[in-house]
């Protein structure tokens, strides 16, 4: 994965930019061949090319049977990668369902981002 993310193996971690550190940490996590990856904001700090590479890797891993659970505020990452979505607000699960069902539940919204903005503005009581 070092080659996939175009990381220089001759550099020490302290010599890397913040974006390169994120790539290094992801390469390390992916190198174990785990069947389940749990990642917090994995595309945070990545440039658009690196984000696209990461999403390609996620799709390849999922095609090989891996499960990837990740948190994000970037709705395009969800649309590009997620089969299912769990929406959490104030520590409570508000919705957990297939992406298509989640989108269908909000026909008056034009996009996933619109849904997220609306849900954040609503006072949801459980």
Segments predicted by a language model, with ranges:
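Conserved H-loop
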Residues: 66-74
